Amino acid sequence: MKSDCSTSAAPFRGLGGPLRSSEPVRAAPARSPAVDLLEEAADLLVVHLDFRAALETCERAWQSLANHALPEEPAGTSLEVKCSLCVVGIQALAEMDRWQEVLSWVLQYYQVPEKLPPKVLELCILLYSKMQEPRAVLDVVGAWLQDPANQDLPEYGALAEFHVQRVLLPLGCLSEAEELVVGSAAFGEERRLDVLQAIHTARQQQQQEHSGSEEAQKPNEEGSVSHKFLSLPMLVRQLWDSAVSHFFSLPFKKSLLAALILCLLVVRFDPASPSSLPSLYKLAQLFRWIRKAASSRLYQLRIRD
């Protein structure tokens, strides 16, 4: 029983001995309304799956932090609450397929990228790289990494490596990735060698793809040129066949007479002159050959019909 009495009295003892009736009772520190709203938002997100309500609750919590800041509240508590609100809000936006709004939604509360918490920035990188849009966070993460105040954080090295793997390498920014790894003291020697090896592998793959595309382009160009040269005789032959068929659609005697008159007008030779006989003979042979070719062509067309 004695031990029970001493045990029950232990919580009421202060630093200077047992609590006297004349001493005032110390009140618990006031709790920020944003903490209650954070718990409510997390409950809406995880339990009720009401993503819109969870996002709205996070926004009300942010307003509460801006309007009702408690002077006795530790600064670290406020930062943790803000980071947790961002995590819940990012998850709610992603669940509603509004992931494109995540970066702008976060920056409206932190104003500048350099002030983003490492955990929030890591979630943004993960989300946008998973949705194959890493370029959206390229400038934001670059600004955060270049800020001297962030380079002393313990999360800096892991976040820089995550940025290289998820953003710079997929975008082909190999020089920027190599400069970041070599110039940063946050990388250990082993991690630096591993990341540089990954950059070297990505550069080799990029060169192979570039050379392969050039080799594939050359046969296509050669094929197009040869196709043009092959199509030219076919075009000439089609024009010739069209002209011959049009010519022989007229009566043969009328065509012969028209050609003879044309020759007389152009060449201007005398049909009665002996010197004109070879020309007339060649002209007659030409028309016989044309007539024979046309008749054989018409015969082939009839067979096909």
UniProtKB/Swiss-Prot annotation:
Single GO BP term: protein import into peroxisome membrane
Region (Disordered): 1-25
Source species of the chain: Macaca fascicularis (Crab-eating macaque)
Protein name: Peroxisome assembly protein 26
Membrane topology: Single-pass type II membrane protein
Membrane side Peroxisomal matrix: residue ranges: 268-305
Membrane-spanning residues: 247-267
Subcellular location(s) of the protein: Peroxisome membrane
Keyword Cell wall biogenesis/degradation: no
